[in-house]
Design a protein with these regions (language model features):
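Transmembrane-helix motifs of polytopic, lipid-linked glycan transferases
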Residues: 119-139, 177, 181
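Hydrophobic/aromatic-rich transmembrane helices and adjacent perimembrane loops
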Residues: 168-171, 204, 213, 297-310, ...
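Membrane-interface transmembrane helices that cradle and orient dolichyl/undecaprenyl
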Residues: 6, 139, 178-194, 204
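Start-transfer (signal-anchor) and selected internal transmembrane alpha helices
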Residues: 1-33, 127-130, 137, 143, ...
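Catalytic lumenal/periplasmic loop and adjoining terminal transmembrane helix
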Residues: 35-41, 251-255, 260-271, 342, ...
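Transmembrane-helix signature of polytopic, membrane-embedded enzymes
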Residues: 19, 24, 132-154, 187, ...
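Transmembrane-lumen/periplasm boundary regions of multi-pass, lipid-linked membrane glycan transferases
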Residues: 50-64, 89-92, 98, 203, ...
Length: 535
């Protein structure tokens, strides 16, 4: 990014060495942390379809490499059969599934299939953490880089998505890298920056429709900071080459690229009609479109308070010189862009912070800048041991609570709420969605289900029957259990996605004591009930 840091970090090779060590250390720490409990997070609603799709990609690749009829493998019919499988719940372009197929092929035998698939988002997350540390350190110094990486690592909901084999962590990492490369190319040119921007943008496009929006906040930023014509030319050059990358990595586009693009855009813009997903927000259920302030409120109540304060500090201290603070300006534009995007009438906004996850690395950078400003202020007043003690106290005040909360919330990362709303109990009382993606159906809970339910038990499940059939297919849930999606049955398992509750689920949830429950700080996330219909 910019060449002049706000704080002194050394010069030349020494400075570069420390940035490299910081980035590598942050990425390694992220990898070790997530690896330690990646198997503890429940298999999420979408993952079984992605597992199946990745397995089909593995089989197709094996046929292409060593099969007897390689020509037919490349036919439009065979490609559509494999790469367009399960479009209703598996509509996204394939890069994240290709990554899952690769990591499971490499490590599945050693780690198990689920952990092998989940290695892909973990690697993307580690790369993202290292990149955030690098950018923060390059722009504002080592303190900023380290604090930015720590801030992102200590956002429980972001950390949770690093455990889950889905689109969200890959597109978040690729969005950040594409933005980083594009800004660097606009400001300084260079083959490396261009290559980073092109490949990251191309892969983002082929991961999720969201990837197509990468240039929008960059253009808005360039209108303020780089109005010369060369900026537009640079963005267009990157976009054109990125489309070529997207074409190469998406076999569905090989035979009919225009039709593939049209279908992707159409599916993405019609989600409210084809697959409306309900959300519980501030005590009301919304079938698809939420109030405009949902993304803003969710940001404020799902990021640890210390990190929010540092982010506000970093933003506020940059405002007087924001015209010269190009990275801070970019971060502000990125966060506001996602808030504005999700406020639009036709934008999907379900599933907590999942659909605007790419905003959080930029918020983390602002927090890193805030930490750098705190240390700079201390340096003006203190020296030696006093400075060290004060800096340590700052870390404790701003980051230690976030660390303790993140550790305590495991493995229910996606249910985290901060003190502004009263934590998890306060969020439940104020009518927020407490869980949504089946991540609370942990291996430990499934094991207890297997112990409690009698042989050949009939079990109705809400809101999804297919999810538990998939658990049986994965060997997690006993296969003699008969799964139903209709009552009456002797047993009823309710997942606490309250936006989808009918009056039946509300009555059971409020009035009946479960046989087995998943609880977080006194709030029920899932419960197994004996069903006794009332007359």
């Amino acid at each position: 990014m910019l060449e002049t840091p706000m704080t002194e970090t050394g010069s030349g090779r020494t400075d570069l060495m420390w940035r490299m060590l910081l980035s590598l250390g942050a990425a390694t720490l992220a990898f070790i942390w997530v690896s330690s409990d990646v198997a503890n997070v429940g298999i999420t609603w979408d993952e079984p379809a992605y597992f199946s799709s990745a397995t089909r990609i593995q089989d197709w690749t094996a046929e292409l490499v060593s099969g007897p009829d390689r020509v037919s493998v490349l036919s439009a019919e065979r490609i559509e059969e494999v790469w367009d499988w399960g479009r209703t719940w598996n509509p996204h372009p394939p890069v994240y599934k290709e990554a899952m197929a690769l990591t499971e092929w490499v490590a599945g035998d050693a780690l198990g299939s689920v952990r092998g698939f989940r290695l892909a988002p973990l690697l993307f997350f580690s790369l993202l953490i290292g990149a955030v540390a690098w950018v923060g350190a390059r722009e504002w110094g080592l303190v900023a880089g380290g604090a930015a990486a720590a801030a992102l690592l200590l956002m429980p909901r972001v950390l949770g998505h690093a455990h889950i084999a889905a689109t969200d962590m890959p597109v978040t990492a690729l969005w950040f890298l594409a933005t980083l490369g594009t800004i660097r190319f606009i400001e300084h040119r260079g083959v490396g920056a261009y290559a980073l921007a092109v490949f990251a943008f191309g892969l983002a496009i082929s991961t999720k429709f969201t990837g197509f929006l990468v240039p929008v906040p960059i253009v808005l930023w360039a209108l303020v900071y780089h109005r010369r014509k060369g900026s537009v030319t640079a963005i267009v050059a990157i976009g054109a080459a990125a489309l070529a990358v997207a074409y190469l990595v998406n076999p569905l586009a090989w035979h009919q690229p225009v039709d593939a693009l049209r279908q992707l855009v159409g599916d993405s813009l019609r989600r409210g009609d084809s697959v409306p997903i309900a959300t519980y927000y501030l005590g009301a259920s919304y079938s698809f479109k939420l109030p405009w302030h949902h993304a803003i409120v969710m940001t404020l109540v799902t990021v640890p308070i210390g990190i929010l304060v540092l982010g506000l500090w970093g933003t506020g201290s940059a405002l007087p010189r924001l015209r010269r603070e190009t990275l801070a300006g970019l971060c502000v534009v990125e966060v506001i862009f996602f808030w504005a995007l999700l406020a639009l009438p036709n934008s999907p906004n379900h599933d907590g912070v999942r659909l605007f996850l790419p905003a959080f690395p930029f918020l983390a950078l602002l927090a890193g800048r805030g930490a750098s400003e705190v240390v700079t202020a201390l340096r003006k007043r203190l020296r030696g041991a006093e400075l060290g003690l004060a800096s340590a106290c700052g870390v404790i005040v701003f980051l230690l609570p976030a660390y303790l909360q993140t550790v305590a919330i495991s493995p229910y990362y996606l249910s985290y709420y901060n003190e502004l709303i009263g934590g998890v109990p306060g969020a439940e009382q104020r009518g927020m969605e407490m869980t949504y993606w089946y991540d609370a159906i942990t291996p430990a809970f499934v094991e207890r289900l297997n112990e409690i339910l009698p042989p050949d038990a009939e079990l109705a499940t809400f809101p999804s029957q297919d999810y538990f059939l998939a658990l049986q297919g994965l060997g997690r849930l006993r296969d003699d259990i008969r799964i139903s999606d209709t009552l009456p049955t002797p047993y009823y398992l309710i997942y606490g996605r309250r936006g989808m509750f009918t009056p039946v689920e509300w009555q059971i949830y409020r009035d009946v004591r479960p046989l087995l429950t998943v609880e977080l700080q006194g709030v029920e996330l899932a419960g197994l009930y004996r069903y006794q219909p009332t007359d």
